[in-house]
A protein has these predicted regions:
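Short helix-boundary/capping micro-motifs
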Residues: 10-28
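Central regulatory/effector-binding core of bacterial HTH transcription factors
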Residues: 89-153
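Flexible hinge/capping segments at coil-to-helix
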Residues: 157-173, 177-199
Length: 299
């Protein structure tokens, strides 16, 4: 197995065709096909399913692709270090639920390591996709929460994907509401007081199970429900409709605006917010620095 073969596999997967990949790599189609066949034979797996309609990644191939990306990234780091090219393009990706502290830490990371060239990604996405991203090594770190309700299901899923959960902090439930909301004068809010107001949550796509929800108490029956995909829309609706969402209570006025406040909710439950990593992965210097930045905003 060679780094060149790994580059071939990744390029074919990204382009979706041997023809386009060969053009992009400046190699002949037969040479590219033979190189991939040799790799499949050596690894004793089928990376691509081949049909009359083209090629698609197999399940084994999808897993292999994640490891291949990590190997190439580590090889690039070695080249940067020992070929005297410290200014090479750095790559890093985090997948997270919608937390302002995750964004703030990402900003700090870029300020510290953002050179002339870098390729960083911050994916605010659905819970299942966070798990998939880290499992397939697309992201080095994933940020989500566990509680008594979802822990059994999510812990089983994490284990089956060779992932580990590392707790960052424990939060008591709060509600995000508009500063002009009728309940904004309260020092604490009950679920009963919220019954008449629209409840906003982040949709979870095809995995729209209570267990994958970003919001605690997702299994509660509510009269008015609105699901959204992004933070800006959720906050606009909170303000425009006197809606609310249930959260950790960690708020940043620069990101969330001065019109949104967090008020404690009367409930004894808690949210154990943390990050997930791959058991077989190695935390990079960028990953370690990002986690240090997280602690700054949580401490």
């Amino acid at each position: 197995m060679t780094l060149q073969q790994l580059k071939y596999v990744i390029t074919v997967a990204e382009t979706g065709t041997i023809t386009e990949a060969a053009n992009k790599l400046y190699v002949s189609q037969p040479s590219l096909t033979n190189a991939i066949h040799e790799l499949e034979k050596e690894m004793n797996i089928v990376i691509f399913n081949r049909t009359n309609k083209g090629i698609t990644l197999s399940k084994e191939g999808d897993d292999f692709l994640g490891y291949a990306r990590q190997v190439l990234e580590q090889a690039a780091i070695l080249e940067d270090k020992y070929k005297g090219n410290p200014g090479g393009k750095k790559q890093f990706c985090v997948s997270t639920q919608h937390y302002s502290f995750a964004v703030n830490a990402f900003v700090d990371l870029i300020k510290q390591y953002g050179q002339e060239e870098y390729d960083f990604s911050l994916r605010e996405t659905q819970t299942y996709e966070i798990i998939e991203d880290v499992a397939r090594l697309r992201s080095e770190i994933g940020i989500l929460f566990l509680n008594d309700f979802n822990q059994t299901v999510l812990s089983k899923l994490l284990k089956s994907h060779d992932l580990e959960f590392h707790q960052l902090f424990v939060a008591r439930p709060h509600v995000f509401i508009s500063r002009k909301h009728p309940l904004a004068v309260n020092s604490i809010i009950t679920n009963e007081e919220l019954e008449e107001y629209p409840y906003l949550s982040f949709e979870q796509g095809e995995h729209n199970s209570f267990y994958f929800s970003e919001e605690i108490f997702s299994d509660f029956e509510r009269k008015k429900n609105i699901r959204v995909r992004d933070r800006a829309t959720l906050f606009n609706l909170l303000i425009g409709l006197n809606g609310y969402t249930v959260c950790s209570g960690v708020i940043d006025k620069k990101l969330n605006g001065k019109d949104i406040i967090a008020v404690p909710l009367t409930d004894e439950s808690d949210m154990r917010i943390g990050y997930i990593t791959h058991r077989k992965g190695m935390l990079s210097r960028l990953g370690s620095t990002y986690l240090e930045a997280l602690q700054k905003y949580l401490g």
